[in-house]
Amino acid sequence: MKINIRDSTMVRPATETPITNLWNSNVDLVIPRFHTPSVYFYRPTGASNFFDPQVMKEALSKALVPFYPMAGRLKRDDDGRIEIDCNGAGVLFVVADTPSVIDDFGDFAPTLNLRQLIPEVDHSAGIHSFPLLVLQVTFFKCGGASLGVGMQHHAADGFSGLHFINTWSDMARGLDLTIPPFIDRTLLRARDPPQPAFHHVEYQPAPSMKIPLDPSKSGPENTTVSIFKLTRDQLVALKAKSKEDGNTVSYSSYEMLAGHVWRSVGKARGLPNDQETKLYIATDGRSRLRPQLPPGYFGNVIFTATPLAVAGDLLSKPTWYAAGQIHDFLVRMDDNYLRSALDYLEMQPDLSALVRGAHTYKCPNLGITSWVRLPIYDADFGWGRPIFMGPGGIPYEGLSFVLPSPTNDGSLSVAIALQSEHMKLFEKFLFEI
C-alpha cells in the first residue's frame, strides 16, 4: 500500500500546562513497552470539511491542556525508575493520503497494511526522544478516512486512552470536557511496608514448551494475524455449553468465549497432554479497588488474571472446565488481591524483568484482552461514528483481542496472532461450537 505523507506537525497544549514529573505506579511499569496501535475507519459524509486537519489539530491542542501528561516525554528519575516528564513537548500529528480504498482492508485484520496507517516511532535515541502519542489521519481514494493512533503504554491503558481520544473528538464537535482526568498515580502506591498476602502467579515466569518448537516455524516471520467474527447466535450456543454434563455453575458469555479460545488455541497448537499452558487475561482494576478510583483516573489500572492448566485437562474436558478456571481467577481479583499485587511488585528488585513481551504470550501460552466494555466507537469528530475500530497490529504471537460489534448486533470478533501453521486449525476449532 502506498502512503503519501502530506504534513507532519508537533501539536502542543493550547495554553500553559504544569511542568512537572508524573510518578508511575508499579502497574504502569510492568505493561509492555510499546505504543499501543489502534485504527479508526470513517466513511465519507460528503462534507466539504471532512476530517479537516485544522479542526482536528485545534481540538487536539485544547484536549492536551487537561490531559497534559500526554504531551510529555518519558524520563528516568534518580533511581532509574521511568516517569513522565510533563514538559508540553507535544504529540505528533500526521496527515497522509493513499490511492487505496477502505474496502481494500476487508475484515480489518490487524496486519502490516493496517500498521502503515499509524506513524512509526523511532526509539533509537532513548526514551526521552519520542512523543507518547502519535496520530495519523489518512485520506482514501473512496473519500473515507482513517485515524491511526499509537499511544505509549506507560502513559495510558485502553480506558484512559479512550477517555482522551473521546474528549478530543467531543472538543472537535464544540463540546466541553465532561469528566476531567485525575492526574495523580499515587492512589496506586504500594503500602509501606509492603504486605503481599497472596502468591502472585501472574508475575511468575510463563511455562515453556517441554518439546521445543521448530525454530524455522516459530519466528515472527511465520506469525499470521487474523480476525474472526462470532455471531450472537454462536455466542448464545457457546454460553449454553456451560450447562453440559450436569454442570450447575453459570459462567458469563465472556468466560465461556475466553475458555473456548484458550481450548481452540491449545488444540490448534497440538499441545501434548502434560504441557502446561498459562492464560493472561487483562483485568481492569478500576471497579475492583476499594475505594473505587476516581472516574477520570488517568494511567494504567491493568492487572492480570492468569489461570494455569495442563493441555490434557483443557482439551479433554468440556468448555466449561476452561471457563471455570478463568472464572475462579477473576473472582479472586478484589481489592485485597490487587493491593497485594502492588505490594508484591514493590518488593521486586527489578520491575523491568517482569515486563510482558513476546516471551510471555508465545506457545504454549496465550493472552486475551477484551475491548468489549470500552467505548471504542464513540470517537465522532463531527463526521459520524467510526465503522470500525480495532488494534492496528498485534506485536506478539499468542496475543488476542476480543472486540465488540460496531453495529450492536450482538456479535463479537476475535483478533489473534498465531503461528501460520496453527491459524487454519484455530479457525476450524473456533467455529466448532
Curated annotation (Swiss-Prot):
Reaction catalysis annotation: shikimate + 4-coumaroyl-CoA = trans-4-coumaroylshikimate + CoA
Organism of this sequence: Arabidopsis thaliana (Mouse-ear cress)
Protein name: Shikimate O-hydroxycinnamoyltransferase
Top-level taxon of the source organism: Eukaryota
Signal peptide: none
Role: Acyltransferase involved in the biosynthesis of lignin. Accepts caffeoyl-CoA and p-coumaroyl-CoA as substrates and transfers the acyl group on both shikimate and quinate acceptors.
Binding positions for 4-coumaroyl-CoA per the UniProt entry: 252-255, 284-290, 370-373
Active site: H153, D380
GO BP terms, alphabetized: cell wall organization; lignin biosynthetic process; positive regulation of flavonoid biosynthetic process
A Pfam family reported for this protein in Swiss-Prot or TrEMBL: Transferase
Parts forming coiled coils: none
Family: Belongs to the plant acyltransferase family.
Enzyme class: transferase
Entry EC number(s): 2.3.1.133
Single Gene Ontology MF annotation: shikimate O-hydroxycinnamoyltransferase activity
Cellular component per GO, a single term: membrane
